[in-house]
Structure formats: C-alpha cells, structure tokens
C-alpha cells in the first residue's frame, strides 16, 4: 500500500480529492464528484472520463458515497422527500428506468508501482472508465453486495490528474413479474400501495414490491484508490481458539498476498500484534509468489509459539465485560522496500452456537432453542433490528448516535436484514461491545430462488464472499444468516456454507431465522429460532400469560409495526393540514401489510383502552402510554421468564429508515418516545416487575425480581405500594434479603386484587441494593378490567384482536397537579448534563411526565439526547430527578415539561 510514510506524506500535499483511510496507501475518493442522467448526455464513457470533458448541467455531489435520489434531493431537484407525500408526488416514480453517470477527478499519488480501485458497493450494474479507457463492463460489475477490486495500474497517471467515470444501471426486474436481481428490498417496510410496483404489467407480486423511485441506485459505499508496491496485503483476519477457564488463546493470522507482476516476487511478510499493557507479538515469514498469484498466507500457533497467548484481555459484549481490542499490523517487504501494509483491530474472543434440550417446539423441526455462548459463558440476547436510511445516506455521526442509544437502552445485539452498509457501523460496534447479526433480506429477491437465473446463481455466492470478507475480522460479528424467513435450497446453502468455511468465519451460522421454513423434501426445518411475531401491539398481560408461543424460546424479530412518534417528530413529516384526523398522508408513511397500512391495531389499542381522541395531541400522548407499557412488558417478561425459557429476542425494530410509523424504538429524528423509555425500563440489568394479573385465574399478580448482570446478587430489598387514582396508598409490602443468580429471576410477592381501589390504580415497584440505594422505581397503571387476547388460536401476528379490553379511561379524570420544576447544568465527560428536578407539593399523583431539553423556550428538543429516565410519575410530596445529557456543541437553555395530568410548563436552565 505504501512504501514509506515520508513519501506518502509528500503525496498528501498534492492529493486534493481524497480522504485518508485507516490503512496507508488506501485513500477514499470523497470529493469532486458529480452526477448526470445518461439520457441527457450524448458523450460516451471514453469522452466523459477525459479531463477535457466539461460537466455542463451535472449535479454536484456534496458527499460520497451517495445514491441517485439522495444526490438529486441534495441538489434541490426535489423538495424534502421525507415530508408528506413528496416521495410520491414530487419525483418521477421511474427514475430507475435510466442509467446514471458518476464522475470525479483526482490526483493519484506518485511513487508507487501499482494502483487499484475498490468498489465495495454499486447498485446494481456498472461500467467503469478511467482516463478514457473502459476498465470493466456491466456484466462484470453486477450485484449490490458484490465488492469489486480493479487493477488500473496501466491507465493511472501517477502524480497528476485522473478522471473516473462510472455508468450505473439500476435494478430493473420486479420479483414475481419479470424476474429478480439480487439487490435489496424494503418489502413491507414501505407501503407498496403507494411506493413501488403498481401493477402495470399482467403479473403482480405475491405480496407487493416496494421501492423508492431510483431503487436505491448508485454508488452506495465508499470508493477507494489503493497505491502499493508489487505485492498487496489484503483481507487480514485473526481467529481465536480460546480455552476457558484457563484463558489461553491460540491465535491464527490469515492474509492474502497478491503479486501484480508478471514475474515471481520473493519477500517477507512481517506482523505485529499489540495492545497497551500487553507484550507485543512479532511475526515474520518468507514468501515467494508466482507471477500474478494470489495466495492466502497464515501464521499458525503450532509454528509461531508466540501466538499462544495466556491471560489475554478478552473482548466481551458490553453487558458482560470490556470489549478489549488488539491491533494487527502486517507489512510485505521485498528488496528491502515496503510493498504494502495493512492494519486491523480485532478482539480475542470465542462465539459458539448451541441448541438447548427444550422440546416445546417439536412442530418447528428437530432440536431445541438456539443460544450463544461468548468466551464460554451463556449470552442472554436482548437485541433489536437495525436499518440504515432509506436512501442509504452515509452518515457516520448518525450511526454513532444510534449506537449510543443502544447502550443507553441496555440492548446488546443488533440485526441487519440485508442493508449491510459500510464497515463503519461494525468498527463502532467493535469499540462499543455491541454484537451484530447479518444476513439476507426476507421474502423478495434473496428468497425467490425459483426465479434466479444463471447470473443470480453467480452473484449470490460472490455476495456472500464479499460480505464475509468485510465482516469476519470484526469482534462484533456474531451471526451470519443465509436466509431470513425462508430456507435456501440445499445446493444454494451448500454453496454459501462452502464460501463461509473457506473464509475462516469463526462465528455462528444459521440457514434460516424462521420457524416456518421447509427443506427440499417439504419437512419443517429450523435452526432453533422462531419468527412468529407479534408484529402489532399487545397488552402487558399477553407477554406474561405464558400461553403464547411468541413469548418463549429464541426469537429473531417481534415488536409493534405501528408506532406513533412524539408530537414534535410527527409535525416534522406530516404537514399541518394533514395532522388530524389520521389520513392517507399518514398511511403513506406506514408499513404495507393490511391493517398496519392504516394503523388499525394501534388505533384500536388506544381508542379501546384510553378512549377516543379529539385531536392529534391527545392521540399522540395516549399512544406513548400504550407504547411504553407494551414495550416494557415485552422485555420484562423475557427477563422474568429466566434463561431456561427465553434466551434471545430481537425487537422489531430499533430505528426508522425514514420518518415512518413502521415499528421502532427510536424514530427517524432520533427522538425517544414512550416505546424508548418503556424498553429502557424493561432492559434494566436488574429490576422488579409486576405481571398484570396475567396468569392462573387472574386473582393474583406476581412480583418478580430479575438479574441480567454477569454476577449473582444478594441482599436486595423490594418495596411494592399500590395507589388509587387520588394518590392514596391502599397497600404496602416489603421483602428483604432477596437474592438472584445471573440470568435468573425470583418471584418475591403475590399481590391480591384490589376491588376497593379506583377503576384504574397504580402499582409502584422499587428495588434497593444492600446499602439502601434505589436501583429501580417501576410504576404500572392497572385497570380493574383485564385485557384478553383470547386463546393462542386468536393470536394474529399481524394485527391486534382482543376478546376483552382493559379500561384506562379513568386516567383522563385524574386530579390536576402543578409541579415545582427547576433545572441546572454541569459538564461531564464532554456532555452538557442537565439535572431536572420535579417536586410534587400536592396530595395527588403527577403522571407520565416528559422532560425535553431545548435551546429556546419554544424550540424543539435537542437531539440526540440521553435521559436517565423519562415519562416519570411523581408521587405526592416526592421529588424526582431526571438527568439529561446533550452534546457539548449544543446550547441548552430551557427545559419543557408535559404530563398526562399537569399543565405544560417551561423553565430556564440555571
């Protein structure tokens, strides 16, 4: 990659069109790009890729990578496509029916013998031209998930200007209509009634085909130029064979060496493994490469004893320990000159997959529930499904903010169903200790195997190869899924697994994450993971009842597909004249499945339980209540069930791909609402929970303490109080000396029914450690009337059906309370931390109080933001503190407070 650091530094002075990548000699081409529709141009690639060509009428690209529609929007061709119906009404829906040219000029560094271009992601086909020469055609450059590396040495102009032109052909085919191309799909994440295929041909897709107007065409991952000597060092990885509890690691280092020359090259591959405070490991071996040869070279512990490491600093998921990382540096030296270098960060850890002995799901196939062990310890998974932006906008700061939210919530795994963006997310996850799951998208191209042609059968394993090579070295990469809802046919999954094995993938592999898959003989097959939802709102008692298959085992996805964001967020994408009543502008931003596409389930849940709303403000507030109690109960039940009954869940979904009502915990604008704080409460490492009278004859409610920390705990104190709506305490219980093993749960109390209480009453559960410090204050609102979804046969995964409904409408008549509020600010670890105090001087309860930190009295909340708690309840005579942290770059001046039975107020931060 680079011969000498000094020479490379000199090149930096002249090289104006790139940003320095993490490896010497590898530079990211980020600047001087422009875009044009091919139909608007007469010139061909040979002309466009010359420095004399004039870019008249081209659209400047503000930051690469970028897809076509993102570029056009950024250049003002279209208004904000995420507002109202703009995506449907303000942009031609057939942008994908034309080719698009990307063009850039850059100066290549001088002093190197070989140059390569790397394209990790082009969607879908492309011609590559440089300096008037075609480097590759659109039969070679095919596949959204295929990475391409092109030797451009003979066409590059070292030390002077070069022109790169890429002609992109978008995905053209429509599944179930005229075939497939192995790009990506938004499936029901977009409402295909509005966005996508509208039945203009004689055939119609089985479900529907949703897509944005350009079908996410373009260069959607970074483009790199690599400058090297005669031999390149590629795709390094370090694998770990870990013995526990002795804590001895046998490391194996792999890397590919490629000889660009037409003659043999002999040299030395040198390596170092280092970590601050640990002894550095030095490696070295001689290598001779044949002309044009690419060879995998390994440093194995049997030959290199220093690769047997005792008591290493292990990489752990952040919920289990520290995510310790080591550095590997490799260098190939020939003729006493550095030909190329490579650097990666890796973790010493083991990830193994297992099946338990549970026979509850024999109808799904053979074997028990899937689970993971990390470094020999059981890993309790509490995850969520992640999505990038709908236009695949490249935004590292946004990714960092989302991962910060993940840790604030207490989630410990993210799943990507295709949509595998750049390595930046994995690099952050390595550092933060957040495990990741990757695999192919359900239902459309990747699972329409009977519609694949010869090209698809070539592109599929090439795509697997490209993604595994990118992901395999990351400590955060835990699971690869060859299929989602379906099971690839035997020849295809055999090919996938062959590639995965060849590339030394040292993590878990599953062929499906569904419990409905069948093999080639028509027999049910599963990998121990269920995928049965629900995908719509459920009452708290549903999760604790113990009679629904969805609440046990290991689940790949389950959550609420109809999520109402905060009012501030809603107003950002729904125009003022479309805010109320709910209408088709809302539906455009919903999912596609029937009932969800009109937000039917969430409206039923809110209206039946909290009463019909007269305006959008009332509806949104009630929806936050519903989201809070549902999401909290979902995570609390998993914890209260203990390791034996529930080993893995993924919430559907973590975040939003655009401003949407499709399921999420964090909305598109990164505003945390009711679902967020319900999830955060349910994901506490230790907590005390109330099961909503869900079991038996419903005459008693269980109070359960769970422990999801890495250690056993003892000496806990539980206090449970019951309040009526007026604020009067009608029952008070305490339990001392509670102990719980890690990943365990203990029932500590049973509460009777309280017929003497109001029609809705509050159950307050507090947990204290052995020093009397409060760990949790968990407040529930419970109706005298129970929710009842009915028997398992009535449980429709995709929409809400209930035989009986709780009546929460008495909450609307709670006595009004005025809180005394003040706020002050300090700086902690580079964040502005605002301490907000809510004091209740009255004899009544102040319910569901949400604080928002703002720059101005009437401004929107500063985002992203991290509160230790929100939507809090303040009991009579008590004071609650909320700590809210925002970036040091922001200017917080005000706190706004809104509650269910308190007037909205704003106070200045002192």
Predicted feature residues:
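Extended carbohydrate-recognition surfaces in non-catalytic/accessory domains of CAZymes
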Residues: 20-118, 198-222, 226-231, 356-358, ...
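Low-complexity, Pro/Ser/Thr- and charge-rich linker/hinge segments at domain boundaries
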Residues: 27, 185-200, 230-236, 349-370, ...
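Accessory beta-strand-rich segments of carbohydrate-active enzymes
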Residues: 34-40, 59, 72, 92-233, ...
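Active-site-adjacent substrate/metal-binding segments within catalytic domains
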Residues: 65-107, 112-119, 123-131, 135-145, ...
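Extended acidic/polar, glycine-enriched regions
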Residues: 154-161, 254-358
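Short acidic/polar inter-strand loop motif in beta-rich domains
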Residues: 169-176, 333-339, 767-776, 902-906
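Carbohydrate-binding surfaces of carbohydrate-active enzymes
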Residues: 255-262, 582-870, 874-884, 893-894
